Amino acid sequence: MSLLLVLSLAPVVALAIYIYIKDKFEKEPLGLLLKCLLGGVGVAASVLILFNCLRLIGISIDLIPWMQSFFGAALPEELLKFLFLIWIVWKNRNFNEFFDGIVYSTFLSLGFAGVENVLYVANGGIGVAISRAIFAVPAHFFFAVVMGYYLSMAKFRKQNKLWFGFLAIAVPVLLHFLYDFFLMESNYYSSIDPSYATSLMFTFYLFDILLWHIAMKRIHKRCQGCGAPIAKGQHYCSNCLPNP
């Protein structure tokens, strides 16, 4: 196995192991997690097919950074992730705890990130592998945590199910758009206005830290039965405590 392939997949494997360990209650079946990973591969293939079809009919979104960020990445990628996720896990009987939505979503997103990483690193080399391991793959992980969080809210909360379902798409799309916009805009202006590009990159780094903070709060501070807020160290709210 080549070094580049190992570097491409190492952050994906590391984050998959991390989220699997964080599932401290009822571990999800490995077969279902494999389906989620393969679903992410399916998302990557679908995105490639979609944009190849658009190019064939003369439609291009590679015009300005915000259009490329939204229409070329955030919207199609996160929407397809959501649709594949619903298809694979929504009616599955193993989807029975709040944290499950986060586990499924992250595995699917990491499947996508793995394919994307291999393609980028194959063309860009070790420098790209290191950069994407620090930023791009964790970003897909963060988007997935937020998507899984709202997906579980839609499944387990008794009210506002459609609203939480909408948020499961809208919030990851927004976060993904902002992430790509700061990065693409800074690259676009790097030779035109270096000081502006530097400020954008600084904003990008701060946004990356914010994503991590948002994701970790979603992972640690929700009841496993219904998704209600709980105190640190607890696993269930008073309404969902298992019978002794």
What are these regions (language model features)?
Residues 1-244:
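Hydrophobic alpha-helical segments at protein termini of multi-pass membrane proteins
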